[in-house]
Amino acid sequence: ARVATRNMAMSRQKKLDKMDVIELAKEKPKPEFNFKEARASGRYIFQTEDLVIGYDKPLSRPLTLSMERGQKIALVGANGIGKTTLLKSIIGEIPPISGKTTLGDYLYPGYFEQEKKYTDNVTCIDEIWKEFPSYTQYEVRSALAKCGLTTKHIESMVKVLSGGEQAKVRLCKLINNETNVLLLDEPTNHLDVDAKEELKRALKAYKGSILLIC
């Protein structure tokens, strides 16, 4: 009787193990990033003239730069040299110390911030609904799931998610807005391997312009 009971217990455990594996596979959706694209921009994305960036003190010498439609440019370098400050100065989020930036015509920019602090009691669903009020709940859930978020993540408050999961919520907004230029500040920083690979593929396929900090 003991052997039979033990065999039954082992049989039940095997079934449970199988169920666990199936459930885990189901609850790890593979991300699919397909950026919605706007009409083509003008020839120039931006031009800077003797731009000096910084806050209290200069972080750069005067920079005269330009970026044309279709270019994909990566800004590389050690932390703290001013890559994010340059990006924010170009888009007008912070004022330069001196010099000027001229933005091109017909720009539909999409900006991905490296870090964003979430403090409000807002679920992922509500966060996307704020951005896309015409979406149905099904469309909101579907958009978030395509970014690799599980049902549990989607129904959670954004502030309790991990850095990688919060990044996927921000990517969801970016992907579903029509853009022709992407300004990305270390977008792969907190992402898992699958999401990193999919984002690389999507950025290669993107027909617009890209300025990327990595």
What annotation goes with each model-predicted range?
Residues 1-36, 98, 133-135, 139:
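Extended, highly charged alpha-helical segments
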Residues 29, 35-214:
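ABC ATP-binding cassette signature C-motif
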